[in-house]
Design a protein with these regions (language model features):
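HTH-adjacent hinge/linker in prokaryotic transcriptional regulators
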Residues: 4-8, 18, 22, 26, ...
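Helix-turn-helix DNA-binding elements, focusing on the entry/boundary residues of the two helices
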Residues: 30
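Residues in the helix-turn-helix
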Residues: 43
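C-terminal all-alpha effector/ligand-binding and dimerization domain
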Residues: 96-238
Length: 238
């Protein structure tokens, strides 16, 4: 299961996106939210910090927490640079998320994968590529590797639904952080085939490592997005 503050942050985010909370009004105070979600004020504070990091809300000292006015102007394809919920949770409020498995095998890691996942050369890994679609429209092409020993029993059914749901709800692992590098690339043959782009169309690549709460790398991935399907939102709250 995901940490409670993450679950609460997701619910508040959903309410913001569906405009249950008006952009010109403060969010309910932390005490009211703690009562509603049957939790502590500290957990609500953690949820608020997560939403601040994602760029959804900001605080005014002595006045409360407010929704950023420009948040709803973002493209449906935009995602937070700090988001590590997985594609299904990130975009499910916009419609139906589906995945097509392009490739799935078990093999040993190369040197880059060993370094990124902090594993030995003889540690088996899952290697899979998935086309992620939102309401039937190609969204991203994700190439992912995961250590077999951390995610035992992973199969095609999980890949077609939600790997992160399997990891968190079935295996009970807690995902707590990510490291990402974003760059523009020329499309590969797979990109052109599955993302329906031209040889001259750039793709946005997010190279990432997702970590468990104890700092263990869970996933090393390269996610490719069409250039015209939004971008990565980076928020500086300093």
């Amino acid at each position: 299961m995901a940490a409670k503050y993450i679950t609460i942050a997701r619910e508040i985010k959903k309410r913001i996106i569906t405009q249950q909370y008006a952009a010109n009004e403060p969010l309910p105070d932390q005490f009211a939210l703690a009562v509603e979600f049957s939790t502590s004020r500290m957990t609500i504070q953690q949820a608020m910090r997560q939403l601040i990091v994602e760029g959804l809300v900001y605080t005014r000292q002595g006045q409360g927490t407010f929704i950023r006015k420009n948040f709803l102007q973002l493209s449906q394809w935009d995602l937070s640079g700090s988001d590590y919920f997985g594609a299904t949770k990130t975009w499910e409020h916009l419609g139906t998320m589906t995945s097509q498995v392009v490739h799935f095998e078990l093999r040993f890691p190369n040197e880059k994968e060993q370094a990124s996942l902090m594993i030995n050369p003889d540690t088996p890994i899952y290697d899979f590529i998935r086309l992620r679609l939102l309401n039937g429209e190609p969204m991203s092409l994700d190439a992912t590797v995961m250590p077999l020993n951390l995610v035992p029993g992973l199969n095609k059914t999980h890949l077609e639904s939600s790997v992160f749901r399997y990891v968190q709800e079935t295996l009970g692992l807690k995902i707590m952080g990510s490291y990402r590098v974003v760059r523009a690339l020329k499309p590969s043959a797979l990109d052109m085939q599955h993302l329906v782009c031209e040889p001259t169309d750039p793709v946005l690549e997010v190279e990432q490592v997702i970590y468990l709460e104890d700092g263990t790398p869970l996933e090393y991935a390269h996610c490719h997005y069409r250039y015209d399907h939004g971008g990565i939102v980076i928020v500086n709250n300093g």
